[in-house]
C-alpha cells in the first residue's frame, strides 16, 4: 500500500521532460478514515475538486498551448491523489504533442481515474471567484484564543440543549483555518464553510474548533472529513455540508466537499478570492 513517506512529497526531484503517468502517486483513504472512525460505509458523499492553473502542451505544429482545468475526484474513490505528484504529472505534458485539446483532456481523465481507482471528471476552465450571499462569517467574533491543537471537538456544541430547540439553516464560514502538511510541515491555508440544518450550532465554539487545527498535521481531504465527523457527532444536524477551499500551491488548489446528501445541498461552485 502506498503511503506519503514513499511519495515525491518532501523530496527534491527533477522536473520531468516527457509525459509520465507513473509520476501520479495514490494514497489510501482508508488509513486516515480509520483514525476518525470511518469504515467502509461512508457517512457522506462528495468530491475533491482540484483547480489546475499551470497546464501546457504542444499543438500539432509545435506551438505551446496553455489552459486551466478542474478535476473532480469522487470521495468514494479508494485513493486520494498526492498533490506534488499531480503537479509533476501535469508538468510532464509541457513537451507532449496533441492534435486536439480534447485528446489531452481524455488522457488526463484516464490517468487520474487509474490513480484514484474511480472515474475522475476533467474539464477545461475554472469556476468563477465568488462567495455565498448568505454566509455568516465567524471571523468577526471577538474571542480570546489559546488552543491551537490538536483539534478539539469539545468546543462544538448546540446553543440550547435543554430548551425546545428551533431548527435553523445556516452557512457558517471562516478564512482563519490553517492546518499543516503531514510530510513537509508546510502550512496549508483555507477558507472553511459549514452549512447545516438543525439545532443552532454555537458560533464561538465552532471558530475555536477551527483554530484548534492550527498546529495539526493532516492532508486537506482528511481535515475536512474530521470536521464533518466531529460536527455531525457533537451537534447532530439533520443535514450537513463541509467544504474547505485551500489556497494554491504548485499551481494547484484543493477543495474537498463532504455532505450528508447530494440532493439536500445544491452546491454553488466558486473559487475563494485567495485562490
From Swiss-Prot:
Chain residues that bind substrate: 81-83, 220-221
Protein name listed in UniProt: NADPH-dependent 7-cyano-7-deazaguanine reductase
Record text on subunit structure and interactions: Homodimer.
Gene label: queF
Family: Belongs to the GTP cyclohydrolase I family. QueF type 2 subfamily.
Organism of derivation: Xylella fastidiosa (strain 9a5c)
Catalyzed reactions per annotation: 7-aminomethyl-7-carbaguanine + 2 NADP(+) = 7-cyano-7-deazaguanine + 2 NADPH + 3 H(+)
Gene3D superfamilies per UniProt: 3.30.1130.10
Binding site for NADPH: 83-84, 249-250
Amino acid at each position: 500500500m502506498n503511503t506519503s513517506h514513499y511519495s515525491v512529497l518532501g523530496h527534491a526531484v527533477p522536473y520531468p521532460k516527457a509525459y509520465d503517468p507513473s509520476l501520479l502517486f495514490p494514497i489510501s483513504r482508508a488509513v486516515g478514515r480509520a483514525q476518525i472512525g470511518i469504515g467502509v460505509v461512508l457517512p457522506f458523499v462528495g468530491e475533491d475538486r482540484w483547480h489546475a492553473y499551470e497546464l501546457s502542451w504542444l499543438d500539432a505544429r509545435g506551438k505551446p498551448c496553455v489552459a486551466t482545468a478542474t478535476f473532480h475526484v469522487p470521495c468514494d474513490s479508494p485513493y486520494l491523489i498526492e498533490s506534488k505528484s499531480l503537479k509533476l504529472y501535469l508538468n510532464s505534458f509541457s513537451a507532449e504533442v496533441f492534435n486536439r485539446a480534447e485528446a489531452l483532456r481524455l488522457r488526463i481523465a484516464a490517468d487520474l481515474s487509474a490513480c484514484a481507482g474511480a472515474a475522475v471528471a476533467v474539464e477545461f476552465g475554472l469556476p468563477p471567484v465568488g462567495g455565498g450571499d448568505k454566509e455568516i462569517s465567524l471571523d468577526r467574533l471577538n474571542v480570546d484564543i489559546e488552543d491551537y491543537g490538536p483539534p478539539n471537538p469539545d468546543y462544538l456544541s448546540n446553543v440550547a440543549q435543554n430548551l425546545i430547540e428551533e431548527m435553523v439553516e445556516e452557512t457558517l464560514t471562516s478564512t482563519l483555518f490553517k492546518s499543516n502538511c503531514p510530510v513537509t510541515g508546510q502550512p496549508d491555508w483555507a477558507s472553511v464553510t459549514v452549512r447545516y440544518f438543525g439545532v443552532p450550532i454555537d458560533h464561538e465554539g465552532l471558530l475555536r474548533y477551527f483554530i484548534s487545527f492550527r498546529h495539526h498535521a493532516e492532508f486537506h481531504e482528511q481535515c475536512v472529513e474530521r470536521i464533518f465527523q466531529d460536527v455531525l457527532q457533537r451537534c447532530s444536524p439533520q443535514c450537513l455540508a463541509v467544504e474547505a477551499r485551500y489556497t494554491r500551491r504548485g499551481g494547484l488548489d484543493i477543495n474537498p466537499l463532504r455532505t450528508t446528501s447530494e440532493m439536500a445541498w445544491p452546491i454553488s461552485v466558486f473559487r475563494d478570492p485567495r485562490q
